[in-house]
A protein has these predicted regions:
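N-terminal targeting leaders that direct proteins to extracytoplasmic destinations
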Residues: 1-64, 81, 88
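Periplasmic peptidoglycan-binding/anchoring modules of Gram-negative envelope and division proteins
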Residues: 52-60, 74-108, 133-137, 173-178
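Short, basic/glycine-rich phosphate-binding loops at helix/coil junctions
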Residues: 65-73
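Active-site/binding-pocket entry motifs
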Residues: 72-74, 81, 113, 153
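Periplasmic OmpA-like peptidoglycan-binding domain that tethers envelope proteins to the cell wall
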Residues: 108-178
Length: 178
């Protein structure tokens, strides 16, 4: 009985091009199937974190997951203090973020188009700051919270109407772990 070496057997059975094609296809298939085993991370978040954010009222946006883009973190005209009901909402959001293991957020403050630009920028920064303080009070790390005053930019309501201006006096909490 004559024994052939493994290499000579392969060379006699398949042409080199077909063998490479088969090996390459098998590797590609393994990579594709390997990606299906674990659920993909969504913008760096686990599926559990995404579920927690969505159930808390966060919406997916270009920025990440955002809470408060059209309310309910609203402010009275020329004010930056949180009303008691809004404070409870922010505390609930903070507890949700903490329990989901999300510690880093950005808080944006906004104003309507009444007033001087510089004043509105400072007012919007203070609005973001009071929201951030509430988040820290429920356990988020102050070093992982960015505060951004946006002033009159990015209105969500029509500044020609009282209702629209009220919608623009807001704060938003954004989670994007990138």
């Amino acid at each position: 009985m004559r024994v052939q070496s493994k290499g000579s057997m392969m060379n006699n059975t398949f042409p080199v091009g077909i063998r490479r094609l088969c090996v390459g296809s098998a590797l590609l298939l393994c990579m594709l199937l390997g990606g299906c085993k674990a659920p993909p991370l969504h913008r760096g978040l686990t599926q559990t974190q995404v579920t927690a954010l969505k159930s808390a009222g966060f919406q997916e946006t270009q920025q990440g997951f955002e809470f408060g883009s059209t309310g309910p973190i609203l402010f009275d005209f020329d004010r930056y203090n949180l009303k008691p009901d809004v404070r409870r909402i922010v505390e609930r959001i903070g507890r949700t973020l903490r329990s989901a293991g999300i510690n880093g957020v950005r808080v944006y403050g906004y104003s309507d188009q009444e007033g001087v630009d510089e004043y509105d920028l400072e007012l919007s920064r203070r609005r973001a700051e009071v929201v951030a303080i509430e988040l820290v009070d429920v356990g988020l790390d102050t070093k992982r919270i960015a505060i951004v005053g946006k002033g009159k930019s990015d209105p969500v309501g029509d500044n020609k109407t009282p209702v629209g201006r009220a919608q623009n006096r807001r704060a938003a909490i954004v989670v994007s772990p990138r």
